[in-house]
Amino acid sequence: MIFKAVRVPFKSGRFAVILNEEDASELGVREGDRVRVRYGKAGVVATVQITREIVEKGFVGLTDLASMELGISDGAEVDVFPSPKPKSVELIKKKTRGEKLSQDEIRRIVEDITNNALSEVELTAFVISSMLRGMDFDEIEWLTRSMIETGERIEFDRGTVVDKHSIGGVPGNKISLLIVPTVAAAGLLIPKTASRAITSASGTADTMEVLANVNLSVDEIKEITERVGGVIAWGGATNIAPADDKIIRVEHPLSIDPRPQLLASVMAKKGSVGAKHVVIDIPVGEGAKIEKVEVGRSLANDFIELGRRLGLNVMAAITYGGQPVGRAIGPALEAREALKTMEDRRGPSSLVEKSLGIAGILFEMTGIATNGYQHARKIFESGKTLEKFREIVAAQGGDESVKAEDVAVGDKTYTLTSQVEGAVVSVNNKSIVKIARTAGAPKDKGAGVYVHKKRGEVVKVGDPLLTIYAEKEWKLDNAIEVANTERPIVVSGMVLEVYGRRGV
């Protein structure tokens, strides 16, 4: 059937069309069915949504993504007709039955994910079946290779390419802002593609964006990395492993991160940027994504094995994840803390030691130094880390002369103080993140939390425990309410209990 196209005013990460219910009935399609939309030589397969009022009879509503793909404007005539389900739907059913998929079958599923041929329900079924039925290492390897092959790739013309990745789960993990320039200052290439926050208060890309442009193309990532040694860019601005972003989109509402997808997601991105040596940061501790050391070790071994199959030299670091890294949580606060640490050549031990430790592992993996940690510390303390970071900021369109004091943070603040004397016995990662997000992070770059006291530190009555920063008064009020409810930092007296009789 021929329809007049009209763009509908909402964005969708998938191809979708909106049909009047009478037209849908005549086409013989129902809500959630597929149709092919053809405009000249261009075409897309889209999911049907049905309405009585939004779109008139004889018109078809197209989401922004579908409109851009077809290259059409309002009023253009398009041909719409039913489209069968892709073959990968049957392959997903096969996995739900617990059967092993072949390399070609996994490739077909990934291609359909990349091309937006699967509905949200079908993609979710694939993710859930992989979690419940599992994947063996052959399947995980094939999934990873398919993710790499269906996206953009970077091939560098010179140098040794390295990379690092943290599996997340710990607030304030701004270590990439120190690791990348430290490693680049040693002559290695480190094209760090980072993520934005999904459930955290700030992803590495959110933090770096305070100081420089992170929306870089693959060509820009290559050019800058070869020129100055490294970048910190948002992976979502590229077409690197595009299936991964679509998988993450359905995992997020369910708060799941199945191991097969986690392994494939990380290693596909590392393989796509040409990395030959990779360090995986696996934070372990109370309130982290992984709370038990043995689970962290198991995951580390899986990363190493998958790397071996892909021809990548992989090492994993089990790191402490029981409380935030550094003291600042939130994009601008973290950028300021990272900058000040580089300027002063000292800072929170959790931030400095973790950053130099992981940079040192990369130095030892590549033969740069036999004692990688000491080599990384020498670079950091010499000021070369800051010098290289400023080069990277300038190459990404930022102000090369920016100082920590120049970074603006939220001007609406509230400080939570201790009501008792004693020592901090716990810092709740999840509560800290909840407060920071309620205050507006990461969308409001200046919002977040600064932790004054961490586990083991002595506290007096009235001492500040944490300060909340916000850009809007009402968000600060909401964050204060959360802070007073959650007990993000717990202080206990040094005497916990008293036994026995008092007096005579």
From Swiss-Prot:
Leading EC class: transferase
InterPro entries documented for this protein: AMP_phosphorylase, Asp_de-COase-like_dom_sf, Glycosyl_Trfase_fam3, Glycosyl_Trfase_fam3_N_dom, Glycosyl_Trfase_fam3_N_dom_sf, Nuc_phospho_transferase, PYNP-like_C_sf, PYNP_C
Residues that hold AMP according to the record: G169, S195, R196, A197, I198, T199, S200, T204, S265, K289
GO CC list: cytosol
GO terms classed as biological process: AMP catabolic process; pyrimidine deoxyribonucleoside metabolic process; pyrimidine nucleobase metabolic process
PROSITE patterns: THYMID_PHOSPHORYLASE
Keyword Phosphoprotein (UniProt): no
GO MF term set: 1,4-alpha-oligoglucan phosphorylase activity; AMP binding; pentosyltransferase activity
Catalytic reaction(s) noted: AMP + phosphate = alpha-D-ribose 1,5-bisphosphate + adenine; CMP + phosphate = cytosine + alpha-D-ribose 1,5-bisphosphate; UMP + phosphate = alpha-D-ribose 1,5-bisphosphate + uracil
Any Pfam family: PYNP_C
Keywords for the protein's UniProt record, in alphabetical order: Glycosyltransferase, Transferase
Claim: Glycosyltransferase is one of the keywords in the record: yes
EC number(s) given by UniProt: 2.4.2.57
Active-site residue numbers: D257
Cross-referenced NCBIfam families: AMP_phos, ARCH_P_rylase, PRK04350.1
Recorded family membership: Belongs to the thymidine/pyrimidine-nucleoside phosphorylase family. Type 2 subfamily.
Chain's role: Catalyzes the conversion of AMP and phosphate to adenine and ribose 1,5-bisphosphate (R15P). Exhibits phosphorylase activity toward CMP and UMP in addition to AMP. Functions in an archaeal AMP degradation pathway, together with R15P isomerase and RubisCO.
Name of the protein this chain belongs to: AMP phosphorylase 1
Organism: Archaeoglobus fulgidus (strain ATCC 49558 / DSM 4304 / JCM 9628 / NBRC 100126 / VC-16)
